[in-house]
Curated annotation (Swiss-Prot):
Residues 249-256 are annotated as: Promoter-binding site. This is RNA-directed RNA polymerase catalytic subunit. GO terms for molecular function: nucleotide binding; RNA binding; RNA-directed RNA polymerase activity. Influenza RNA polymerase is composed of three subunits: PB1, PB2 and PA. Interacts (via N-terminus) with PA (via C-terminus). Interacts (via C-terminus) with PB2 (via N-terminus); this interaction is essential for transcription initiation. Interacts (via C-terminus) with human PKP2 (via N-terminus); the interaction competitively inhibits the interaction between the RNA polymerase subunits PB1 and PB2. GO terms for biological process: DNA-templated transcription; symbiont-mediated suppression of host gene expression; symbiont-mediated suppression of host mRNA transcription via inhibition of RNA polymerase II activity; viral RNA genome replication; viral transcription. It comes from Influenza A virus (strain A/Swine/Tennessee/26/1977 H1N1).
Amino acid sequence: MDVNPTLLFLKVPAQNAISTTFPYTGDPPYSHGTGTGYTMDTVNRTHQYSERGKWTTNTETGAPQLNPIDGPLPEDNEPTGYAQTDCVLEAMAFLEKSHPGIFENSCLETMEVVQQTRVDKLTQGRQTFDWTLNRNQPAATALANTIEVFRLNGLTASESGRLIDFLKDVMESMDKEEMEIVTHFQRKRRVRDNMTKKMVTQRTIGKKKQKLNKRSYIIRALTLNTMTKDAERGKLKRRAIATPGMQIRGFVYFVETLARSICEKLEQSGLPVGGNEKKAKLANVVRKMMTNSQDTELSFTITGDNTKWNENQNPRMFLAMITYITRNQPEWFRNVLSIAPIMFSNKMARLGKGYMFESKNMKLRTQIPAEMLSGIDLRYFNDSTRKKIEKIRPLLIDGAASLSPGMMMGMFNMLSTVLGVSILNLGQKEYTKTAYWWDGLQSSDDFALIVNALNHEGIQAGVDRFYRTCKLLGINMSKKKSYINRTGTFEFTSFFYRYGFVANFSMELPSFGVSGINESADMSIGVTVIKNNMINNDLGPATAQMALQLFIKDYRYTYRCHRGDTQIQTRRSFEIKKLWDQTHSKAGLLVSDGGPNLYNIRNLHIPEVCLKWELMDKDYQGRLCNPLNPFVSHKEIESVNNAVVMPSHGPAKTMEYDAVATTHSWVPKRNRSILNTSQRGILEDEQMYQKCCNLFEKFFPSSSYRRPVGISSMVEAMVSRARIDARIDFESGRIKKEDFAEIMKICSTIEDLRRQK
């Protein structure tokens, strides 16, 4: 089905074609090798922006630290991180004046959250720096390891299950003279293989205990591991992102909860909302500025870009903001919230894996770990790397660089948005006290500024004043990358505004196509993506119909399930033809079994199994939806599943789709190669957690999910639940007396075993 692309644009206004200029087709670029170089760039740049600050030495770790706060005022347009404390505090005061009670109310909301949040909040999130093993781990494993090591050292507050109690353990751990940790190691030995009589290397994995003194422990607790950000489109160079450890995560979560609560109450904030809600918020601000610019006034909009937002922000400034925001709150609450910025102003950036060297004839490869960079002879490196290493050397301690100024990517998005909005707030006429005034939108480091004035000179003066105000707060608007237009045309967080928002369809392109989960989920996700784009992104009926046909084609090629009456030969075609011939009602076969496609743009909301159920042969229904079918390892499927789709910018988002459990909902098995590596012990731990959690969910299904209250272990909670359920089932006659007795006996046995342990 070939389509002439020009046909798509016959009736499209020029500005709607913006999406064709976006770099979103094809695969995004991924990084390979180590992120060490990118991390060194970040550390060096951050220090360069703040170079005229004051140097001090951290008393606990001995790390040199640069403090640019209240540094010299800028004399040129170069980006700097010299935020002025009094200016930040004043901006906060004005923000509160414009929104009476905003900080007070947000603090009360946050206090409630702090008291109710459970430790398992920290299991969300992907990679986390596991300080016990000195490498990245899935969040759940890293948390479990941390709690296990805390328990070894007599820190058991977290057993209450509240996050705030876990944080008490973290605080106490910092005061301990030494911490004992359990770490993994591997032994290699050469043994003779009985079968082949050859020598082979055998690896065994062990756990060993190790003691860390106070200094080493604190360094690890303050360490952020770094990785390269993958799949970033439209950039020539890669950049580093940070993965913090478990000690920092909980504190950051509470600060961000407070900041999120404030952002929700600010009309200029592009966070935490998204999608259509965000567009509505933006449209409101634009409408306000347009209606208020009377016939005599001009209105211009800057599509803004800030230079190195993260590297010029400063945790000390965030501490000042939090101190102000929480000034009338209880002492304990102020302390909890001030710890995250304090930890960040003493942070260490781990340099990653180090460098890989190859000899000229490619015979020898060797890895130089980051720990060795402080002492190695620099003649082996090329010029640019040599300069980087020389610059960073004074900051190195055990393969991590002291990085006091700057915020690593993505850490305090909400709080930095509050800072940005506080400047937009200063643009009201009553504050500018002159003929020009401004308003705008802020979402993390992205902003749009709308300036109104009587003439062009006034507009220029307004922009200049905004620019200088930003400088005082450590924000550097880029004059090269920001551009100004008559209000009505601008871009903000990749939303294009042209008298209303233009659908930027190319952004959704990466999520079209076959996801590769399994036949059942892929069909469902594919049609849901098309449905969602018809609702949200101006995907017209003709294009949607075409997208659907292309998707079905793609799906059939992926799973080799061409129609039973096709001429295409694949590995599956023999079986599919056989099924086709013996099926009475061919329309009832799923597409993945060689059936016809019954989807059109009117019925995309119906799962395929439901769409075809009435058309299926009885025996086909029986095979398709049979939980006892031996060829399928079933996971229990909720009625709604979540798929991860890749939008063009921002993190992968989850998308709900309807899931009907059939024999096509298989789950692929884990790759075996991991079982021979040092990760094996970790994998076993992970499977154990998985099993425990699954078991727990069986006892407390989400429909009746009330958290077991009080300090009871998972086992105690499950045993007591089993007893209650058994009694109810017995009394209502659902189970026999013998079954009831057996359940009670098993429960007692479990309790006895626990006591003996």
